[in-house]
């Protein structure tokens, strides 16, 4: 029997008997926030770990890289799983593992334990992030697209600044921040247990575990349009996540633990606010604005290093963050709404694979260059120049397509079943 539209598939709305749609959306958004907060919470703690365990900037880049690689592996293997077994089972398992990983972080006694914890954290994040993103779109396509853009930035901001504040003002910060996150994850597991399933299980779960990246026909051209922006904005995120604490301390003589977290907070906080303020704009407009403002912000932030101006650095960071938020939102809105409900997990996994590759590879290269040449400022300027080039290419590419029809107007091709 032929299906006329994607809406003919089983309903993806939460069924009665569980949490309301609004509560489900907020719960799912909070899980994304927690995933990203737990990742960025490590950033302000790197100087403490370095002082206690005596490892190099290259080791920091490696710790960052293993997390990104683990996320990528999980996305490739389990990114489509929730499209087959449902959102809840994947989220319960991934979030429970996150809680256990926080306990491992809290009692880490060396670099090896830190690396192991980051690997497990990356695997659980990769398994859960596509499922939670698809779940938000299931609940409410319009608000879910906005939540998918604002929640990662909000989590990154909160994790960085809260960890920085704990380092600065509270005892045992390398324990407290993780134990707090563990408690939050446990509460979220309970919340997911109370939530109705938005994606009915169907056959094909085992086959979905074969590592692959697949996109529905309707999303292939749009993701080519969005990819340059994704690469630019997430390369920026990698720069701040890996180098910001050391950069703030070395260039401006400020306390790395607190101000390194604040730098990440300014970047991600500006991104989150920009998403909310620009959510009614067209996807292409968002990507054009995002690439242009990101270019300007990075230029100001990098220039501030030569003049040792913290004010200019944070101003540039705020502008770059605005570019990150709007650019990422534009990319999400360009691609994800075109996917049918049973395809959303797979589509989001492709988006996050591109994003984490763009975030992880430059950060690793930067860490290697710092360790080899010992010049943080030169590396930061070169990294910034690369991000600016990526932003410029994304801007030019998006403007060149400005005369073509908006990609979000394309509808997903109907599927035929017999």
Regions found by a protein language model. Give the residues of each.
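Conserved MFS/SLC helix-loop-helix module at the cytosolic interface between two early adjacent transmembrane helices
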Residues: 72-111
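A late C-terminal transmembrane helix in Major Facilitator Superfamily
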Residues: 332-378, 383-384, 394
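Helix-loop-helix hairpin linking two adjacent transmembrane segments in secondary transporters
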Residues: 147-193
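C-terminal transmembrane helical hairpin of 12-TM major facilitator-type secondary transporters
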Residues: 286-331
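Transmembrane alpha-helices of Major Facilitator/SLC transporters
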Residues: 259-283
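Cytoplasmic helix-loop-helix junction between adjacent transmembrane helices
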Residues: 117-152
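Symmetry-related core transmembrane helices of the 12-TM Major Facilitator Superfamily/SLC fold
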Residues: 176-192, 380-397
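Helix-breaking motifs and short loop linkers at transmembrane-helix boundaries and internal kinks
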Residues: 54, 86, 107-112, 171, ...
């Amino acid at each position: 029997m032929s299906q006329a539209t994607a809406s003919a598939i089983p309903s993806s709305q939460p069924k009665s008997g569980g949490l309301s749609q609004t509560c489900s959306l907020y719960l799912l958004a909070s899980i994304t926030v927690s995933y990203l907060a737990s990742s960025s919470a490590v950033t302000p703690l790197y100087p403490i770990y370095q002082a206690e365990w005596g490892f190099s900037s290259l080791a920091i880049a490696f710790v960052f890289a293993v997390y990104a690689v683990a996320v990528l592996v999980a996305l490739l293997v389990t990114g489509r799983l929730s499209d087959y077994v449902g959102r809840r089972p994947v989220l319960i398992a991934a979030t429970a593992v996150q809680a256990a990983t926080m306990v491992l972080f809290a009692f880490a006694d060396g670099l090896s334990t830190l690396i192991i914890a980051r690997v497990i954290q990356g695997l659980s994040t990769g398994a859960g992030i596509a499922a939670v993103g698809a779940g938000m779109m299931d609940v409410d396509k319009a608000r879910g697209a906005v939540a998918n853009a604002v929640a990662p930035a909000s989590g990154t901001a909160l994790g960085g600044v809260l960890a920085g504040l704990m380092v600065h003002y509270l005892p045992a910060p390398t324990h407290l921040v993780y134990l707090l996150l563990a408690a939050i994850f446990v509460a979220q597991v309970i919340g997911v247990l109370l939530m109705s399933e938005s994606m009915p299980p169907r056959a094909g779960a085992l086959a979905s575990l074969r590592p692959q990246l697949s996109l529905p026909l309707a999303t292939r051209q749009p993701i080519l349009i969005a990819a340059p922006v994704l690469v630019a904005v997430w390369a920026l995120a990698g720069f701040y996540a890996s180098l910001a604490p050391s950069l703030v301390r070395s260039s401006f003589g400020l306390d790395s633990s607190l101000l390194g977290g604040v730098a990440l907070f300014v970047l991600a906080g500006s991104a989150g606010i920009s998403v909310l303020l620009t959510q009614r704009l067209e996807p292409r407009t968002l990507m054009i604005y995002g690439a242009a403002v990101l270019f300007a912000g990075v230029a100001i932030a990098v220039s501030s290093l030569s003049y040792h101006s913290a004010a200019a650095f944070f101003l540039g960071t705020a502008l770059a963050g605005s570019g990150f938020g709007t650019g990422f939102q534009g990319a999400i809105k360009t691609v994800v709404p075109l996917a049918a409900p049973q395809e959303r997990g797979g589509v989001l996994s492709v988006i996050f694979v591109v994003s984490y590759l763009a975030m992880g590879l430059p950060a690793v290269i930067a860490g290697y260059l710092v360790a080899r040449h010992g010049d943080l400022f030169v590396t930061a300027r070169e990294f910034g120049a690369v991000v600016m080039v990526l932003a410029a290419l994304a801007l030019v590419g998006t403007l060149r397509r400005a005369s073509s029809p908006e990609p979000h107007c394309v509808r997903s091709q109907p599927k035929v079943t017999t």
